[in-house]
Amino acid sequence: MRKNIVAGNWKMNKTLQEGLALAKELDAALKGRTINCDVIIGTPFIHLASIAAAIDTTRIGVAAENCADKESGAYTGEVSAAMVASTGARYVIIGHSERRAYYHETSPILMEKVKLALSNGLTPIFCVGEVLEEREAGKHFEVVARQVEEALFTLDQTDFAKLILAYEPVWAIGTGKTATADQAQEMHAHIRKSIAAKYGKEVANGCSILYGGSCNAANAKELFSRADVDGGLIGGASLSVDKFLPIIEAF
């Protein structure tokens, strides 16, 4: 079901103690407020169980930032979708541009992660996006549609409907650059059109598509006002309640 969502992505930040304090501070800040979106925080693996136990998870959903593409076994250092689910987390970020770039995660790998997440009752937040060279070459629509198609279009309609998508213009992450609200809307509409062509309009119109590129308190309201922008996947600003809360309240 299509929802407004603001999801934080802490990346590789915060010790366990710092993360627990931040999650509790956010939980306290949201208590008693009227919030018009679902709030999720994506944290490093070591935080998941402690945070899920310490906050009201009906108020704030907890997400892992990744999971393994294997079910279990001799994969030293990996964390399976089943392990993530056992912590009390309900979501997992898959396919973030940093995972694609630094750890060479390809569509076949991401497809396995999505399937394992779904089979363990997790909701994937699946990321797609183009780099600057692809946008400047006019290939951005083609690239993003292909990322969606290659990793997700083997899913049946029921499973696809469980996904949250996030569009991250890679050239706008951590650079201070932001896609304009019109650029975001244009790409989100293109993604939704691609979904409709495969699964039909009902599934496409029921899919939440978040914007994930340097979204902050100053631009969130304008971005979220666009018809196909259903919220944000927030990086740096999610590390501070003072910066994250105004984005949540932009709806």
Swiss-Prot record:
PROSITE patterns (alphabetical): TIM_1, TIM_2
Top-level EC class as recorded in UniProt: isomerase
GO molecular function: triose-phosphate isomerase activity
Positions that bind substrate: 9-11, 174, 214, 235-236
Pfam name, any one: TIM
Assembly information from the UniProt record: Homodimer.
Name of the protein described by the UniProt record: Triosephosphate isomerase
Record lineage: Bacteria, Pseudomonadati, Bacteroidota, Bacteroidia, Bacteroidales
